[in-house]
From Swiss-Prot:
RLWRNWE repeats lie at residues 34-40, 61-67, 86-92, 107-113, 134-140. Residues 1-22 form the signal peptide. Belongs to the scoloptoxin-08 family. GO terms for molecular function: toxin activity. The keyword Isomerase does not apply. Residues 23-94, 112-118, 139-167 form a propeptide. Keywords: Cleavage on pair of basic residues, Pyrrolidone carboxylic acid, Repeat, Secreted, Signal, Toxin. This is U-scoloptoxin(08)-Er5b. Expressed by the venom gland. Residues 147-167 are annotated as: Disordered. It is found in: Secreted.
């Protein structure tokens, strides 16, 4: 009886049951023993643990980047609201002081609107710059992770190939 099994405990159970029934070939038993050794291999376990830890660190880093971005946006909104209030109070004071001078009030209003538009444009530019930086960092992190995984996979394949060659 030959079997190809991904789960070592299940393979062991199949071999034990088949052995009781007298149907086990030596090659099947060797295959199950080899699978079991690979499963218990500390190097293999360590590689899996390292990959898991790298993935956790990457998720934490992405989460911190997102939280930092959210905080910056909230602070920018707060600062923008404070500037608006200050500009509005200034405009009201000037409006009261210059009630008789309608042209000056209109000019102040236009200046205030222009300032508001420039502030919104500057804020949008800053947010876009921050977004581009964050996307670039994420791309670099992902690229580095993929290179590391590829190198780990190649070294693992070479090592497994050598082990299989010895058997």
């Amino acid at each position: 009886m030959k079997t190809n099994c991904e789960f070592p405990l299940l393979c062991l159970l199949i071999v034990l049951v088949a052995n009781v029934e007298g149907e086990v070939e030596d090659t099947g038993l060797k295959m199950v023993k080899r699978l079991w050794r690979n499963w218990e291999d500390p190097e293999q376990r360590q590689l899996l643990d390292q990959e898991t830890e790298l993935e956790k660190q990457r998720e934490k880093r992405l989460w911190r980047n997102w939280e930092d971005l959210e905080l910056r946006q909230l602070l920018n909104e707060f600062a923008e609201n404070q500037r608006e209030k200050r500009l509005w109070r200034n405009w009201e004071r000037r409006q009261v002081a210059n009630e008789d001078d309608g042209e000056k009030a209109k000019e102040l209003w236009r200046n205030w609107e222009d300032l508001k538009r420039r502030q919104v444009a500057d804020l949008n530019d800053e947010q876009e710059t921050q977004r581009d930086k964050r996307l670039w960092r994420n791309w670099e992190d992902n690229h580095a992770t993929l290179r590391k995984r590829s190198a780990d996979s190649l070294s693992r394949q070479k090592r497994l190939g050598k082990e299989r060659g010895k058997e």
